[in-house]
Swiss-Prot record:
Changing S112A: Blocks pexophagy. Its main location: other. It is found in: Vacuole lumen; Preautophagosomal structure; Peroxisome membrane. Disulfide bonds: none annotated. The gene is ATG30. Residues 45-63, 278-291 have a biased composition (Polar residues). Residues 1-63, 266-291 are annotated as: Disordered. It is a peripheral membrane protein. This is Autophagy-related protein 30. Interacts with ATG11, ATG17, ATG37, PEX3 and PEX14.
Amino acid sequence: MFSRKQVQKRNNELSSLHCSNSSNSLNRIHKNEETAKGTVGVNARGNNRSDNVASPGQLRPRTSSILTDNSEWILFSPENAEGEYVITSSDGIRRTNSNHYYYNYNEDDILSSSRRSSEDVYDAEQEYTEQPVNNHVQVEDEEDDDSIINDLTHVVDDYDYEEEDDKQDLTTRIDNWRKKQVSELLNELNHDDDLDPVLNRDKIDLIQSWGIENEKLNTKPRAKKRQRKSKRASFYGQDLLSKYSMEDLKIIKQIVAQLRDDLDKVKHDKPSSPLPNYHNTLKQAPSSNSQNPSFISYYSNYLTKNNSQQTPNSQSTSGSLLNNPNLEKYLPLFLKNLLYEDSNGSHQHPETSEKEHFWDNDLKSVNSSILTLSSNSKLKQEIL
């Protein structure tokens, strides 16, 4: 058994050792706070503390200097009967608390103030981050409200119930759309010069079936169109050919092709005598044994066949040729003079001076007309 003095001595040694360890940590806290406050004399107190701190592994002997008024050490007494520690400080203030060690300064106030300041900073940051969004949303809501009010004010002032009823009527809307489409189509028809007449007529009939007034149709300036076409004559005889129908032009095409072949044959022949008189050639009857009939025989047979369908009582080829009402229609002027024959069947030829120069002058004009018609005529492309 240990004596009471030994136990007390042991407790004093333990308390001194524990006090030295605790004082080191509390001195560090105290030094940091003094640095923050800008107090003077930190180095001096630090020197005093370094003098009083024992080296590790050594027990600092108890001296009376620990309990002096200038000392900053905190001494812990052994546990009392009530289970509390008596905390002694240099300023003479004693505090008791179970299971805690307190320093002279009011650390609760410091920690609570720092905690409150951190909470205030956090709350301020939250308010700063949330406030712009809310303000933006609030501004947008206010602007939307203002725009809606302005729009509604305009609608209420200019509201027309009859017009609204008409818009709601589906039949009226369809009719308005149809009229708009028809007006655009009419505008296109009136400004399209290259439109097919048959297609144009079909479109106009379709528009009339929709109940459109006739005053809106056929408003195209026809006179100007004809005038423009008349200025575009690009080949010889265009004004004459424009009077023929498509069927007549097909017949003329066949006749011109046969005439070209016959003229080429006569041109490339090498007769022993001078160039024959074309009028005398007309007097000669076509040979029935000839394999290649001449243009005169071909055209006479064609007109005979055509005239027999129109006048069944015709008696002779020459009479049908001369009395055919289509003679002036199908034969150009220079050919009609060559094939002219009176009603008695006798051949009458015009002035000799004109016929002598036929092969030199008129044949060139015929070839020129044929070549122009075959190459540059848009009308020939329609015939083909």
